[in-house]
Amino acid sequence: MPRVKTGTVRRRRHKKVLKRAKGFEGSRSKQYRNAFQTLLNAATYEYRDRRNKKRDFRRLWVQRINAGARLHGMNYSTFIGGLKRAGVDLNRKVLADIAAREPEAFKALVDAAKNGK
């Protein structure tokens, strides 16, 4: 078998890494070694933050629902508990959207939660 020199393979691999490192500052986007190390760290942040994103959005939805419920004299936990008892089966994402965009519909949900006791 003939010996394969690494030139073209290395260049292709380095180009791939440097392409992914576009937008990084300074030598992190220009030099292969710095770009590679930065991409390793970026991958751990990507992995971590894909999971944190779910937590962050749920917290945002809860805050929006709580704000909407407090406008009608109720807090979040009693509102959610009342909805469960009333048999309203909407998730927090939808409830937050209704609270932000359709105040009349949210008022009806608050009334349902109050009567669901």
From Swiss-Prot:
GO terms for cellular component: ribonucleoprotein complex; ribosome. HAMAP family: Ribosomal_bL20. It comes from the Bacteria. InterPro entries: Ribosomal_bL20 (IPR005813), RIBOSOMAL_L20_CS (IPR049946), Ribosomal_protein_bL20_C (IPR035566). NCBIfam families: rplT_bact. The keyword RNA-binding applies. Belongs to the bacterial ribosomal protein bL20 family. Residues 1-24 are annotated as: Disordered. Residues 8-21 have a biased composition (Basic residues). It comes from Deinococcus deserti (strain DSM 17065 / CIP 109153 / LMG 22923 / VCD115). This is Large ribosomal subunit protein bL20. Binds directly to 23S ribosomal RNA and is necessary for the in vitro assembly process of the 50S ribosomal subunit. It is not involved in the protein synthesizing functions of that subunit. The keyword RNA-binding applies. Keywords: Ribonucleoprotein, Ribosomal protein, RNA-binding, rRNA-binding. GO terms for molecular function: rRNA binding; structural constituent of ribosome. One of its GO terms (biological process) is ribosomal large subunit assembly. Transmembrane segments: none annotated.
